[in-house]
């Protein structure tokens, strides 16, 4: 799944991504980078709304796993169980969130668990 295909998928399946005007800059085995402009994600202080920053980070992490699973022939059913984010400073312009799929060991464990028909968990980080 390339960047254009992922962006189309997100806009069709996750309507919030279209409302936030996200653009997928890169998508591949190495990870995903998503850009969001300021205007549709602005708050009352003329900076990025914290919920928008969190949503774009989650989209990047979810997408990195989704792209990798599809590349491996796994039909993904991904659910975000927990999300935590630290806000270190206001974001005053369009911004990107970047995420990579799990490292080799975590990926191998995830695939093995899914192959046994069991629910699996994996931790994925995103950086805004």
Where does each model-flagged region fall?
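Hot-dog-fold acyl-thioester-processing enzymes
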Residues: 35-62, 74-75
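A short, structured loop/turn motif at beta-sheet edges
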Residues: 27-30, 90-95, 128
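Non-catalytic linker/capping segments at the edges of enzyme domains
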Residues: 1-35, 39-40, 74
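Short, well-ordered amphipathic alpha-helical segments that serve as non-catalytic structural scaffolds
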Residues: 60-64, 124-125
